[in-house]
From Swiss-Prot:
Disulfide bonds: 24-29
Keyword line: Copper, Copper transport, Cytoplasm, Disulfide bond, Ion transport, Metal-binding, Oxidoreductase, Peroxidase, Secreted, Transport
Name the UniProt record assigns to this protein: Methanobactin mb-OB3b
Cytoplasm among keywords: yes
Quaternary structure note: Monomer. In the absence of copper, may exist as a dimer or an oligomer.
Cross-link 2-(3-methylbutanoyl)-5-hydroxyoxazole-4-carbothionic acid (Leu-Cys), where in sequence: 20-21
Task of the protein: Chalkophore involved in scavenging, uptake and suppression of toxicity of copper. Each apo-methanobactin (apo-mb) complexes 1 Cu(2+) or Cu(1+) ion to form Cu(1+)-mb (Cu-mb) which is then taken up by the cell. Enhances growth rate in the presence of copper and reduces growth lag upon exposition to elevated levels of copper. Cu-mb contributes to the switchover from soluble methane monooxygenase (sMMO) to the membrane-bound particulate MMO (pMMO) by inducing transcription of pMMO subunit A. It also stimulates the enzymatic activity of pMMO.
Induction: By low copper concentrations.
Compartment(s) where it occurs, according to its Swiss-Prot or TrEMBL record: Secreted; Cytoplasm
InterPro entries attached to this UniProt entry: Methanobactin_OB3b
Propeptide: 1-19
Binding site for Cu(2+): 21, 27
Species per Swiss-Prot/TrEMBL record: Methylosinus trichosporium
Lineage: Bacteria, Pseudomonadati, Pseudomonadota, Alphaproteobacteria, Hyphomicrobiales
Length: 30
């Protein structure tokens, strides 16, 4: 497994988190 494959799986999750948290996942969720 490479980092790029892991990123492809994680990015959609981050996108959903951003939508749920008001499009500001670094400041709202983390």
């Amino acid at each position: 497994m490479t980092v790029k494959i892991a990123q492809k799986k994680v990015l959609p999750v981050i996108g959903r988190a951003a939508a749920l948290c008001g499009s500001c996942y670094p400041c709202s969720c983390m």
